[in-house]
Amino acid sequence: MKLGLSSFFIILFFLCGPAYAKEFYKEFNIKVSGIKIGKLIWTIKIDDTYYLNSLKLKSEGFMSAIYRFSGEYYSEGFVKNNKLNPTKYSHVWKTKKIKKNMELTFKNNRLHSLNQTPYEKEKLRVDVFNIKKAKDPITSFLQIILGENSSLVVDGRRVYTMKATFNKKNNKTVVDISNYSNLWADHKRSKFEKITFEKKSGSPLPLKINIYFDGRVFGLEQI
């Protein structure tokens, strides 16, 4: 059963009261081709005015001896008319060879600033600061999980649209990625394709998520 965002806040209000935030915490194994490569911790704090969304992942399993990684993804913002509106987003990605940082701020339903390291010397190919109603990727995904059908995304490297289709028979939602544009040159030609997720009836967050990226499938299974 799909839980709409308005229904979610009604339940949240009656269970917790307007003065208390509800916190959700889940752990997932990360797998590729059935092999565990890491672990993800997902924390959400949300009430009727504010939300915080945090994902932390780290390499685990025997593959970590070959390829070590860690990442942190964070967004926060305000809730208005049952819509999530980001004010800040950041992510950090580390391996043995690289460390990448991205920081975005949002104001008046638009991207306000973009800072990243390593610094990008190329000029922006898209006038991303004048795109209305753009949101960071983890705010967009959370909004879809809670019942919205679509969201316009800017992640600092790309702009794209998430559009969800729910299948009642298998209780699975497919989030297609469309209108895909790179803000800078992508020399690896990598592409974000789609996301699928499954939820248990009455649960606001998924039990299983599959991320289709650059011809590979990254599976997240709740521990």
Name these PLM-found stretches.
Residues 1-7:
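Positively charged n-region of N-terminal signal peptides that target proteins for export
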Residues 7-15:
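Bacterial N-terminal signal peptides
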Residues 8-9, 115, 142:
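Serine/proline-rich low-complexity intrinsically disordered segments, especially terminal tails, linkers
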Residues 17-21:
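Sec/Tat signal peptide C-region and signal peptidase I cleavage site
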Residues 22-106, 143-223:
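Acidic, serine/threonine-rich low-complexity disordered tracts
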Residues 96-136:
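Hydrophobic, well-structured mid-protein blocks that either form specific transmembrane helices
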Residues 131-149:
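A contiguous pocket-lining binding segment that forms or flanks enzyme active sites
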